[in-house]
Amino acid sequence: MKRALSFVLIISMLSILLAACGSDSSGKDGSEGASASEQESKKAVLVLPEKIGVNPFFVQMDEGFKKAGEEFGIEVKTIESTDPAAFEQNLHAAVAENYDLIMTATFQAEDALTKVATENPGKSFAIVDTVIDLPNVRSVGFKEYEGAYLLGAAAGLATKTDIVGMIAAQDIPLIKKYTEGFREGLASVNPDAKFLINYAGGFNDVAKAKELAIVQADQGADFIAGASAVGDLGVFEAAKEKGFYTSGQDTDRTVEDPEHIVLSQLKSTDSIAYEELKAFANGSFEFGYVSYGLKEDGVGLTFVTRDSESPLSPFIGQEVVDKVKAIRDQIVSGEIVVTDPLQSN
């Protein structure tokens, strides 16, 4: 009887020990799960310097940001601002809420982000479409000159008068990425074409841009590209009145007047926001400067790199689109290297 009882006790103790070993193993697995959960619980916030409204630049960026958050398991939030003071307050709030990455965009954000990032060297920031040279900021730019090259090539192939124009905002380095890229693309397919260029003197002068576009139309230009930001509205008005063809910038403006606005040079802010958050999620995010071009889907041209809701204008036509697509492929492969006007001197 005693021997039997001893045997039962031994079996019981072995069972307890085995159960304890099992508990230790489960605890280790649970700890690994918690670690994975911690990785997935990263938080990122998009703080915009103005209200999204119907601004396609910010609408696209917000969409790409949220898409990446959902796909890569990052908690994301978008904060809109009503004015510069509110924007700086929102950046401070994002820091206080301990977001792992704080992203923003455009030159409007430069001053406030420079201040907040300097005050918080341990936080990670990213800014799109401008450059802030700080050790805790990732600046994301665009190779606008590659998109402009495609636009210039399309204009050079489509023009019937061999006179092509552009209304640009100002004669400054940033705008040269548009004007010189366009000029290079135009000359590559139509070296005999005449290129007219005028500057509106700012980014918001609708009346001046319209006036200059009419002057170019009277000189025989049948295609006049808009590169004057808000001033492009004046170019669009002139196109309706004078019957020439034009193009928009950043987002697909063809939907506003497909008869006259036949192309748009694109900045893919949705792709940028998505890729930057993806890099943050997988650990490849680095501070410093990075630039997105055709290869990275950062820039493009309607009908060539992205479809449009608008019908393709007969002025452009499928033959021109196909030729420009081939040029796009040559740029992506490196067969054609478009000159960066800011690095060419």
Q: Where on the chain are the PLM-derived regions?
A:
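Sec-dependent N-terminal signal peptides
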Residues: F7-M13
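A residue-level marker of the well-folded mature domains of exported/periplasmic proteins
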Residues: S23-N345
